From Swiss-Prot:
Gene from which the chain derives: NRPB8B
One annotated GO biological process: DNA-templated transcription
GO molecular function: DNA-directed RNA polymerase activity
Coiled-coil regions listed in the entry: none
Protein name in UniProt: DNA-directed RNA polymerases II, IV and V subunit 8B
Entry GO CC: RNA polymerase II, core complex; RNA polymerase IV complex; RNA polymerase V complex
Chain's role: DNA-dependent RNA polymerase catalyzes the transcription of DNA into RNA using the four ribonucleoside triphosphates as substrates. Component of RNA polymerase II which synthesizes mRNA precursors and many functional non-coding RNAs. Pol II is the central component of the basal RNA polymerase II transcription machinery. It is composed of mobile elements that move relative to each other.
Subunit structure: Component of the RNA polymerase II, IV and V complexes. Associates with the mediator complex.
Location, primary (coarse class): nucleus
Localisation: Nucleus
Organism: Arabidopsis thaliana (Mouse-ear cress)
Keywords of the record: Nucleus
Top-level division of the source organism's lineage: Eukaryota
Family the UniProt entry places it in: Belongs to the eukaryotic RPB8 RNA polymerase subunit family.
Length: 146
C-alpha cells in the first residue's frame, strides 16, 4: 500500500556537514551517499529540529502524497484523523521539484533539484532511478534515522 506511493527510497550515510562552510544558523547542508542505488545528495536540514552527524545513517523517501491510499494531498493538516506515511518517519518536508537535468558521458547522470521552502536538495545519480519524476511536481521528503 504505502510502497506504491513512494517514488524513491534508499539508505544514506552522512559524509560531510556544511562542505562549503556554515551559511545559516539552524540549517546544515548535508552531503550524503546512498547504499543501494549509489546516489549522491546535498540536502539542507533544519538541524535545530533534526540534528545529524557525520556517519549517521538514515532512510530517505520521496512521495507525492502522505495518504496511504495514494489520494492527493489536500494541503490541510488534520491531526490524528488517520494514519499517513508520515507516521513511519521522523522528519518531513514538503516542496517542489524545480529543475531536472541530465549529463551524458561514460556514466550518464541525472540531477533533481527540489526546494522545501528555501531548504534545497540536489539528488544525483543513475537516470533510471529518478526518471519518473516530473518538473514542478510537489513532493514530500521523509527521513528516519537508522
Amino acid at each position: 500500500m504505502a510502497s506504491n506511493i513512494i517514488m524513491f527510497e534508499d539508505i544514506f550515510v552522512v559524509d560531510k556537514l556544511d562542505p562549503d562552510g556554515k551559511k545559516f544558523d539552524k540549517v546544515t547542508r548535508v552531503e550524503a551517499r546512498s547504499h543501494n542505488l549509489e546516489m549522491f545528495m546535498h540536502l539542507d536540514v533544519n538541524t535545530e529540529v533534526y540534528p545529524l552527524a557525520v556517519g549517521d545513517k538514515f532512510t530517505l523517501a520521496m512521495a507525492p502524497t502522505l495518504n496511504l491510499d495514494g489520494t492527493p494531498d489536500t494541503g490541510y493538516f488534520t491531526p490524528g484523523a488517520k494514519k499517513t506515511l508520515a507516521d513511519k518517519y521522523e522528519y518531513i518536508m514538503h516542496g517542489k521539484l524545480y529543475k531536472i537535468s541530465e549529463r551524458d558521458g561514460k556514466t550518464p547522470k541525472a540531477e533533481l533539484y527540489v526546494s522545501f521552502g528555501g531548504l534545497l536538495m540536489l539528488l544525483q545519480g543513475d537516470p533510471a532511478h529518478i526518471s519518473h519524476f516530473e518538473l514542478d511536481q510537489r513532493l514530500f521528503l521523509l527521513m528516519r534515522k537508522l
